């Protein structure tokens, strides 16, 4: 190997190491912001929220018909939360909810949600949101072992009433579920 190949290899490795350092620095910064948002929402909530599950829908393209015919798609239940709007107008919430799952068994979930919020109309009461939720759930068919969740969130709302939703990805006959609920802010 000539010297230029050594220089090229060294340069490539050096640049990769610098990039990894930046990624870890950004991850530290992101985790700090995440933790601070949770603490601020817990300590300084602007609203108390009531959660009412509305619909569970199993994507028909991802299930055998005999399975979907047996599944519960009316998730009875409810929940409570704390929330706030930040200086950018984004929503932050802490919540706990329990509902009847696909097998009509109780499923609890608790976590933190964040949505970037847009107000596209002249009427500032109308809002759209897109974000994520991170939390813990437990299911009967997993013996109620706590399971971490990281899921997308989307919403449409007017004033203190919001229709919020997520999609649980999965494989054939497992997951691929749209879940939505009403959130009332007080």
Swiss-Prot record:
EC number: 2.3.1.251
Signal peptide start-end: 1-25
EC top class, as a word: transferase
Disulfide bonds: none
Molecular function per GO: O-palmitoyltransferase activity
Coiled-coil regions listed in the entry: none
Reaction(s) catalysed by this chain's protein: lipid A (E. coli) + a 1-hexadecanoyl-2-acyl-sn-glycero-3-phosphocholine = hepta-acyl lipid A (E. coli) + a 2-acyl-sn-glycero-3-phosphocholine; lipid IIA + a 1-hexadecanoyl-2-acyl-sn-glycero-3-phosphocholine = lipid IIB + a 2-acyl-sn-glycero-3-phosphocholine; lipid IVA (E. coli) + a 1-hexadecanoyl-2-acyl-sn-glycero-3-phosphocholine = lipid IVB (E. coli) + a 2-acyl-sn-glycero-3-phosphocholine
Highest taxon listed in the record's lineage: Bacteria
UniProt-listed InterPro entries: LipidA_acyl_PagP, OMP/PagP_b-brl
Transferase is among the record's keywords: yes
GO biological process per UniProt: lipid A biosynthetic process
Residue numbers marked as site, Role in the phospholipid gating: 172
Keyword Acyltransferase in annotation: yes
Active site: 58, 101, 102
GO cellular component labels: cell outer membrane
Keywords, sorted A to Z: Acyltransferase, Cell outer membrane, Membrane, Signal, Transferase
Pfam family name, one: PagP
Site residues, Role in lipopolysaccharide recognition: 67
Subunit composition and interactions: Homodimer.
Annotated family: Belongs to the lipid A palmitoyltransferase family.
NCBIfam families, sorted: PRK11045.1
Functional summary from the UniProt entry: Transfers a palmitate residue from the sn-1 position of a phospholipid to the N-linked hydroxymyristate on the proximal unit of lipid A or its precursors.
Protein name: Lipid A palmitoyltransferase PagP
Organism: Escherichia coli O157:H7
Lineage, highest ranks first: Bacteria, Pseudomonadati, Pseudomonadota, Gammaproteobacteria, Enterobacterales
């Amino acid at each position: 190997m000539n010297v230029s190949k050594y220089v090229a290899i060294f340069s490539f490795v050096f640049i990769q190491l610098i990039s990894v350092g930046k990624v870890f620095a950004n991850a530290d910064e992101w985790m700090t912001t995440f933790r601070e948002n949770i603490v601020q929402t817990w300590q300084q909530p602007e609203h108390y929220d009531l959660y009412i599950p509305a619909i569970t829908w199993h994507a028909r393209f991802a299930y055998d018909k005999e399975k979907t015919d047996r599944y519960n798609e009316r998730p009875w239940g409810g929940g409570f939360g704390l929330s706030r709007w930040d200086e950018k107008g984004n929503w932050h919430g802490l919540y706990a909810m329990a509902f009847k799952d696909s097998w009509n068994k109780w499923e609890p979930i608790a976590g933190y949600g964040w949505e970037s919020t847009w107000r596209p109309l002249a009427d500032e009461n109308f809002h759209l949101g897109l974000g994520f939720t991170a939390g813990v759930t437990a299911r009967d068919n997993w013996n109620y072992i706590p399971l971490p969740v990281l899921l997308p969130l989307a919403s449409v709302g007017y004033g203190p009433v919001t229709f919020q939703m997520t999609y649980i990805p999965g494989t054939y006959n497992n997951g691929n579920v749209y879940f939505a609920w009403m959130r009332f802010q007080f």
